[in-house]
Amino acid sequence: MLYIAVIILILLVLYFIYENLFMLTVRREKLGSGIRIAHVSDLHKRRFGMNNERIVERVKAEKPDIIIISGDLVSRSETDFSPAEALLKGLHELAPVYMIYGNHEQSIYRENLRAFKKMLSRNQEILLKNGCAELTVNDRTLKIYGLLEDYGVYKKNGGYRKLEVLKESDIEKLLGKCPDGEVLLLAHNPFFGEEYAKWGAKYTLSGHVHGGSVRFFGKALLSPERRFFPKYAKGVYDFGDKKLLVSAGLGKLRLFNPPEIVIYEI
């Protein structure tokens, strides 16, 4: 019995190493037709080849009309932003790139913040901080909003107890009323999916949870806030005719939860 347990443990360790060093998956979700969106999220300090070329090549093969980066392109402790910059440049050659800050961009160590902002200024992504951009693709006009919520929804007083709660009214204060038409909302934190839908976004693209880090039988284990079994961790969640689209992301250690790029057809 011990012999079998040792073999299982060795196989588990080998798979863990393989998953975290070599795997990169593409998940495709067909929600409509006419526009292809590539969703990249939560890279953190992970690297996928020289200049993150594996990510760029996978996205290129999908021929997207739009590329979304839903936060945590870097980690708060990062000092070398050249891999992130190379990724931005590579993606921009494929399609328009829209991005938002995640909780890590909001809390980058002060000594590195200037270098990070300079890196962004050299590139041509469209950074949305409680702002909106309009894009016409295949005769359809999309209004793309980027939400920068209060950091208290992620961490408060150095911990994860009594976090701030985001309501529809808070979103309206930050973004204004949701307009008519096709509205995409980029919001790093998926836990407020119902509120995003109430605000009126047809599609909300989120990340943050890393798919739950560890997944068993398709269920997420843990959120970054140290909460077990997070409700919105990976996949498509319906709120009437509105949808929350959550990527499991690319970075951080994970098990039975491969790094992913997501392609949505809407």
What are these regions (language model features)?
Residues M1-T25, D65-I66:
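Non-catalytic terminal accessory segments
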Residues E105-Q106, G211-R215:
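Short gly/pro/ser/thr-enriched loop/turn and capping motifs at secondary-structure boundaries
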